[in-house]
Amino acid sequence: MSVDISTVKRVAHLARIAVSEDDAERMTGELNAILGFVEQLNEVDVEGIEPMTSVTPMKMRMREDKVTDGGIAAAVVANAPVTEDNFFVVPKVVE
């Protein structure tokens, strides 16, 4: 896949970025170089290799999945002018 100057201008327009003609030409070359590197990555044989979440093998530390109220509901609503059963009470704004 390669990028031409019209594609660079179109992407810049979609991203709402002002790009001069000189910058568009320069970016065309840079984007083509990046895409060339990505195409090289597609050639690597990864058959039988497990996906990794990190470059170093490590176990994810997981906590027990249990439902709690957090124990801080009263502290959260402590500064609110009006509360009811640990919920904020606000004036009705829509009829």
From Swiss-Prot:
Its EC number is 6.3.5.-
Listed InterPro entries? Asp/Glu-ADT_sf_sub_c, GatC
Biological process GO terms, please? glutaminyl-tRNAGln biosynthesis via transamidation; regulation of translational fidelity; translation
Name of this chain's protein? Aspartyl/glutamyl-tRNA(Asn/Gln) amidotransferase subunit C
Function field: Allows the formation of correctly charged Asn-tRNA(Asn) or Gln-tRNA(Gln) through the transamidation of misacylated Asp-tRNA(Asn) or Glu-tRNA(Gln) in organisms which lack either or both of asparaginyl-tRNA or glutaminyl-tRNA synthetases. The reaction takes place in the presence of glutamine and ATP through an activated phospho-Asp-tRNA(Asn) or phospho-Glu-tRNA(Gln).
Q: Which GO terms describe its molecular function?
A: asparaginyl-tRNA synthase (glutamine-hydrolyzing) activity; ATP binding; glutaminyl-tRNA synthase (glutamine-hydrolyzing) activity
Q: Which UniProt keywords apply?
A: ATP-binding, Ligase, Nucleotide-binding, Protein biosynthesis
Q: How does it assemble?
A: Heterotrimer of A, B and C subunits.
Q: Which PANTHER family match?
A: GLUTAMYL-TRNA(GLN) AMIDOTRANSFERASE SUBUNIT C, MITOCHONDRIAL
EC category name:
ligase
Q: Which cysteines bridge via disulfide bonds?
A: none
HAMAP family assigned to the protein according to its UniProt record, in alphabetical order: GatC
Species assigned in the record: Brucella canis (strain ATCC 23365 / NCTC 10854 / RM-666)
* Pfam families membership: GatC (PF02686)
Q: Which family does it belong to?
A: Belongs to the GatC family.
- Kindly state which reaction or reactions the protein catalyses: L-glutamyl-tRNA(Gln) + L-glutamine + ATP + H2O = L-glutaminyl-tRNA(Gln) + L-glutamate + ADP + phosphate + H(+); L-aspartyl-tRNA(Asn) + L-glutamine + ATP + H2O = L-asparaginyl-tRNA(Asn) + L-glutamate + ADP + phosphate + 2 H(+)
